[in-house]
Each structure stands twice: as C-alpha cells, then as structure tokens.
Amino acid sequence: NLKNYFSNLPTLEVIIWAHGLNCSDKISNFNYLDLTELLNSNVLFIASCINELGNLNKISTGARLLVVSSIWQIESRKNKFSYTVSKSALQGLIKSSAIDLGEDNILINAVLPGVIDSPMTRKHLSSEQIQAVKKQTALSRLPSPEDIANTVSFLVSNQNKSITGQSFVIDGGFIGSKNNL
C-alpha cells in the first residue's frame, strides 16, 4: 500500500523514477495482460506515486521530479508495441503533471536515453549490434551513463528554475539518423 509506505517518508525535494518493464509484441499479437502490466508499471505507478505523495503533503514546494524513460517514448520500434505504448503515455503524464504541479513551483521532466554504453548493453547486444548502433548515431558512439547522470543532475538541481513538462533525448543523435532502424 503506497499510502502506508509514503506516510513514513519525510517531505521530499527530489524524486526520480528509474524503473520499468519491457516486452516484445506487435499490435497483431499483443497480450492484454502484458500491456496492462506495462501500463501499470511504467505509467500508473508513477501517477499513483505523485498523487499519493501529494495528498500526504510529502512533495515540497519547489520540488524536482524526474522520470527516466526511453527514446521509445517518442519513437516507434518494431516488435515493441506494448512497450512503446506505455512509454508514449508517459509523455502525457509529464506534460499534464507539469501544469498541475506548477501551481506549487514543482518541476517534472523526463530523460529519454537511447542505447547506452553500459554493462547491461554489452550483456544483451553483441559487439556487432553495438557497432551497428554506433554507426547509426550522429556522434558515432553510444552515450555514457555519465551523460544521463549529468542531465538528470541538472534537471533535479536548483539551477533548473523553469524547465518543466519536457522530455530530453540522450541518444548521441540516434533518432536524428535516417537509417536508425
């Protein structure tokens, strides 16, 4: 129960959601339960957290909220129907929440990483696949975890005075490439 858990927390100045589920499917064969599970995890959990924390007055005035999402929030991807639908729904959550939360000077944004140079990437992609992705980026390299962390750090800092309702792509120019998929 979120209410019981959150009631013991102090008032929060920064909240970051960096979680999610993924699955592979198409519109022609998606499973309703899988889509529902992804929507619950990737979208409704965040909305419920914001709602419950707000109702308990656990979000301080001027707080910074941030969602770590994915480039698939704004792009389509073959065989990732449920995942991209759930990530796309985050776009609406971020924009709509920014309007409501702005009344209390609370900022909410998202970062949308692409393929990152990380142990997880090396575990799930072959070196050939990684090289192919690198070739499809404007910078001919993958962003580092530090690239993501630096953007997150700024967005949740007091240096960020007026950026809200925005989603920042960190993909080394992958989306901008015409040959990326």
Q: What is the predicted function of each stretch?
A:
Residues 21, 28-50, 66, 90:
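Catalytic Tyr-X3-Lys loop
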Residues 55, 99-100, 161:
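Alpha-helical segment proximal to the catalytic Tyr-Lys
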Residues 102, 107, 163-165:
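Short, small/polar-rich loop/turn modules that mediate ligand/substrate recognition or access, typified
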Residues 64-89, 94-103, 115-116:
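Catalytic loop of short-chain dehydrogenase/reductase
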Residues 3, 7, 17-36, 55, ...:
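Conserved mid-core segment of classical short-chain dehydrogenase/reductases
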Residues 112-123:
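Short, flexible catalytic-loop segment of classical short-chain dehydrogenase/reductase
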Residues 137-148:
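A conserved structural motif in NAD(P)-dependent oxidoreductases
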Residues 153, 164-181:
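Short C-terminal tail/terminal secondary-structure segment
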